Amino acid sequence: MSQLSNPSQAFLRQRGQLSGRILLCSPPADAIAAELRQTGVEVSVLSWDHTAVNACRGAVAEEWLFTDLALPADAQWDQIALFMPKARELLDLMLSVVAPALKHAQHIWLVGEKREGVESAAKRLAKEDWDATKVDSARHCQVWSLTPPADWKPKQNDFWRAYELAQEKVDTLQLFTLPGVFSAGRLDEGTEVLLQSLPELHGRRLLDFGCGCGVIGATLKKRYPKASVELTDINLLALKSAARTAEANGVELNVYASDGLAEVQPGVDAIITNPPFHQGVKQDTRVTQQFLRDCARVLKPGGSLTLVANRFLPYPDWIEAHVGPVRVLFENSRFKVYHAVR
């Protein structure tokens, strides 16, 4: 089971109780679906993670993406496994999405790492009159068995957050975010200093990598209305947020899922990004390092990269190794904004 994450390994310890049709909600990006299929169960997947969906393809009967924030009203499974989301506030969203199917399920599981809050989530549900029983602990994870109260209804919450951003040189932006999307409900400091430090950009094709709610992409389109602006993310809730941000501001943005730069076609004139370097509660620079390696393929000769990062991370060495000489456009006690031309 070396290809399985700790939560998946903990869940598979329950294989003696797994049968029939199972819905995996927000599973890790690993081989959990394929492992379950080998036990004879029929697996469906509901996920907002582009990478996890790709990992499950070929091993599932059905898949849904959290794009419409709803399941068919008649959707039914024998068992439902809720994998603890990396952002804790997403659990309420997940429960709201699967609510129509919960009453039909014979068994509901909650699985996750202790440090990602699975125990506190289970105890919170218990305070809301759920029957929550811890059935296993392994691999620094816990597995809980859940039963909702007979009169349970999902929280009435449209889950959208909105805020405005006033900037120089462009109109005030209306920004929309869903739970778990980076910089949800407010502009983070890193993106703020990046936008304030942007150099003059050249070319017709601009890319916002790891777009979150779309604030960078929308700003670029306002500043360069003739440019084609692309926004990518692996979080499908981020893409939904960015699409709504585009609509609210009357701008046309090309928003699509991409695992790093894998789905981005070559010929980009400029990449502007506050790149992701956290996976759940762990710091992880692998995504950014792979992104920088791929920049040479995606950027045109003479194309540029503008990037904000925590100042303690060794971005200059990585950027120079894969893109070109680095200039520091801005720095303070927390962040640096780097610019390089291929």
Swiss-Prot record:
The keyword Methyltransferase applies. Pfam families: MTS (PF05175), MTS_N (PF08468). Its EC number is 2.1.1.172. The keyword Phosphoprotein does not apply. It is an enzyme of class 2 (transferase). Gene3D superfamilies: Vaccinia Virus protein VP39. It catalyses: guanosine(1207) in 16S rRNA + S-adenosyl-L-methionine = N(2)-methylguanosine(1207) in 16S rRNA + S-adenosyl-L-homocysteine + H(+). Keywords: Cytoplasm, Methyltransferase, rRNA processing, S-adenosyl-L-methionine, Transferase. GO terms for molecular function: 16S rRNA (guanine(1207)-N(2))-methyltransferase activity; DNA binding. One of its GO terms (cellular component) is cytoplasm. It is found in: Cytoplasm. InterPro entries: DNA_methylase_N6_adenine_CS, Mtase_sm_N, N4/N6-MTase_EcoPI_Mod-like, rRNA_ssu_MeTfrase_C, RsmC/RlmG, SAM-dependent_MTases_sf, Small_mtfrase_dom. Specifically methylates the guanine in position 1207 of 16S rRNA in the 30S particle. Monomer. PANTHER family: RIBOSOMAL RNA SMALL SUBUNIT METHYLTRANSFERASE C. Belongs to the methyltransferase superfamily. RsmC family. This is Ribosomal RNA small subunit methyltransferase C. It comes from Hahella chejuensis (strain KCTC 2396). The gene is rsmC.
